[in-house]
């Protein structure tokens, strides 16, 4: 799950490059991220690296990750550092880490 449409496209591209057919749910806001997340049984969150995004991700019991740069989302990371960087962050979520542990 993520907030923005472009963010979701970057996550989907990274997942496909990892040979995953996982669905990406785009929630369009941090508020919706927490709300929609409570309706879904399991998953992980690629949070925007800002106060609202992190707070929403922490409300859910799932693994969650964020870009290493404050203010960035997955699409910003994709544009700055490439798809490999997005894959690397996603692998942490797949391994069950919360918040880039």
Locate each region found by the language model.
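TOPRIM fold recognition
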Residues: 5-101
């Amino acid at each position: 799950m993520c907030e923005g449409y472009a963010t979701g496209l970057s996550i989907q591209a990274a997942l496909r490059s990892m040979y995953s057919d996982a669905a990406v749910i785009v929630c369009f806001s941090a508020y919706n991220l927490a709300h929609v997340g409570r309706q879904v049984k399991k998953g992980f969150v690629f949070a925007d690296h800002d106060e609202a995004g992190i707070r929403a991700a922490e409300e859910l019991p799932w693994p969650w990750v964020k870009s290493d740069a404050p203010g960035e989302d997955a699409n910003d990371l994709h544009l700055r550092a490439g798809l490999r960087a997005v894959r690397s962050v996603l692998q942490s979520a797949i391994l069950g880490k919360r918040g880039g542990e």
